[in-house]
Amino acid sequence: MADVEPTIHHMGDFLRAENAAGRPWLPASHNILRAFTIPFDSIKVLIVGQDPYPTPGHPVGLSFCVAPNVHPLPKSLVNIYKELVDDLGVPMPTNGDLTPWTERGVMLLNRCLTVGVGRPNSHQGKGWEEVTEAAIRALNARTDADGKPQPLVAILWGRNAQSLEPLLTNAFIIKSPHPSPLSASRGFFGSKPFSRANQALVTMGADPVDWTL
């Protein structure tokens, strides 16, 4: 990630300028790079989001995740949970905290790491994509002691995430429409991404993910 450090510094300048202009942004600064805090070699599944929730109190630096005290849940997350329960038969989660997934090898990465309050997509094209795409390339390039690609499943929901597929040449790709209410009924429901991810991991010689929350 050293090659994108100048971009990260540039984004810090951009965010300070936004603050100075009276345009607040999310998530809190200590959560902006939270997706990168899990051990890189532990990552088995990548789930890509577009940008953080633009509602204060909602985004916590992990794609689709909210803090445990947030109710009602964002509608996209409600639909993810419906599909999780339908796919695996696990209990319906009681809150929107996806942190346990990250502790089991799931990277929850937004392509754009910040957003203006109440302004979806407002920070797209400002530089974050260069940072997150560098991370995805590095994930894809990981190899084991024998030089073979490390097991990786990429779950790509919606066209924005699916545009990253060319960077994921060594990953097993699972793609469907986005879980938002606008598109979930067009192929997200019934796509069984969680069981398919586990089947792919086992085929690659890796342990399946415990998706229970």
UniProtKB/Swiss-Prot annotation:
| A UniProt-annotated Pfam family | UDG
Q: What does this protein do?
A: Excises uracil residues from the DNA which can arise as a result of misincorporation of dUMP residues by DNA polymerase or due to deamination of cytosine.
Instruction: Give me the Gene Ontology terms describing cellular component.
Output: cytoplasm
GO MF assignments = uracil DNA N-glycosylase activity
EC nos:
3.2.2.27
So what does this thing catalyse? Hydrolyzes single-stranded DNA or mismatched double-stranded DNA and polynucleotides, releasing free uracil
Q: Which residues form the active site?
A: D51
**InterPro entries given in the database record:** UDG_fam1, Ura-DNA_Glyclase_AS, Uracil-DNA_glycosylase-like, Uracil-DNA_glycosylase-like_sf
Name its GO BP terms in alphabetical order. base-excision repair, AP site formation via deaminated base removal
Name the record gives this protein: Uracil-DNA glycosylase
Q: Superkingdom of the source?
A: Bacteria
Annotated TM spans: none
Checking CDD domains in the record gives: UDG-F1-like
Organism of origin? Bifidobacterium longum (strain NCC 2705)
Task: Report if keyword DNA damage is assigned.
Answer: yes
Localized where? Cytoplasm
Alphabetized UniProt keyword annotations: Cytoplasm, DNA damage, DNA repair, Hydrolase
